């Protein structure tokens, strides 16, 4: 019965409909919405690692719930104007050049980026800390019906990994989303190259580079605020370590457990996304919505509203 209802083959009776609403703790108005389900950027994950289909579907559904909430909020308030530079790798050049261009367009000064989340949100892209229910999923991007990008990042990750994930997803938005991509291209590698150059410009990295050791990697992590592993990989890509040095340092990191958890003294605090929360507060503090009214507008219950 439920399977046929889910597939649209059967229409539930009023009694069954009420039961479903009560069990799932959603008001009837939630199921009466006519919103389309948008597929997020899942194809890249399918190519990279194995994730159970049910985990993907659950993530997709939850992401769409957040998207619908945002779209409802945007009927009353405006987001910062969208300023998303677009880049065609086949026409304009390598992902690293795209990252340099974004830094220029967004007027990011030299050196490390102190708060990438704020810069992204200031340019009209919503960042949503999100529980994917799987540590295998770092982040995903999705475009709202009004063409506003939303980046979801795994809220269970450490701050350095969140920053790299944000930059990685931004790379997909800048270079891939909505573009025709030849199958021969490795979009995951391109997004990582973009992220690495955005967060750690090669010219500055090389200028300050010392002899590579675990200690120097830790000190560089403290400054650049991305993982020791990512910095070691960048050094290899820039031919600053030999293959043997690279393997040896990775073996040392694995032996010390750094591949799963890097030393606490180099921890990077997670950045705080504020745009979604500010939209909610604007409705209650300035537009005069009560919690019940706001919950009704979003087609959720007050308990779920408080959890946003």
Regions found by a protein language model. Give the residues of each.
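Active-site hotspot residues in diverse enzymes, especially metal/ion-binding acidic/histidine motifs
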Residues: 1-308
């Amino acid at each position: 019965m439920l399977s046929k209802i889910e597939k649209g083959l059967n229409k539930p009776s009023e009694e069954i409909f009420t039961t479903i609403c009560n069990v799932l703790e959603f008001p009837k108005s939630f199921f009466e919405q006519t919103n389309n389900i948008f597929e997020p950027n899942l194809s890249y994950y399918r190519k990279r690692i194995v994730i159970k289909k049910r985990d993907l579907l659950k993530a997709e559904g939850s992401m769409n719930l957040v998207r619908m909430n945002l779209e409802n909020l945007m009927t009353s308030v405006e987001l910062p104007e969208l300023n998303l530079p677009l880049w065609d790798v086949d026409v304009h050049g390598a992902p690293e050049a795209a990252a340099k261009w974004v830094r220029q367009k967004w007027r990011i000064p030299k050196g490390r980026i102190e708060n990438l989340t704020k810069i992204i949100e200031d340019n009209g892209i919503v960042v949503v800390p999100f529980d994917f229910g799987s540590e295998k999923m770092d982040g995903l991007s999705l475009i709202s019906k009004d063409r506003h990008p939303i980046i979801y990042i795994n809220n269970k990750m450490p701050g350095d990994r969140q920053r790299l994930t944000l930059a990685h997803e931004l790379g997909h938005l800048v270079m891939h989303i909505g573009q025709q991509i030849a199958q021969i291209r490795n979009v995951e590698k391109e997004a990582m190259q973009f992220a690495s150059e955005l967060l750690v410009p090669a010219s500055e990295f090389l200028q300050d580079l010392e002899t590579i050791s675990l200690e120097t990697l830790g000190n560089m992590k403290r400054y650049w605020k991305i993982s020791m592993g990512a910095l070691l990989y960048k050094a290899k890509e820039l031919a600053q370590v030999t293959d043997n040095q690279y393997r040896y340092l990775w073996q040392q990191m694995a032996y010390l457990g750094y591949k799963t958890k890097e030393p606490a003294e180099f921890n990077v605090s997670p950045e705080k996304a504020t745009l979604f929360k500010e939209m909610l507060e604007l409705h209650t503090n300035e537009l005069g919505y009560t919690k019940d009214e706001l919950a009704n507008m979003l087609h959720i219950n007050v308990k779920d509203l408080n959890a946003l």
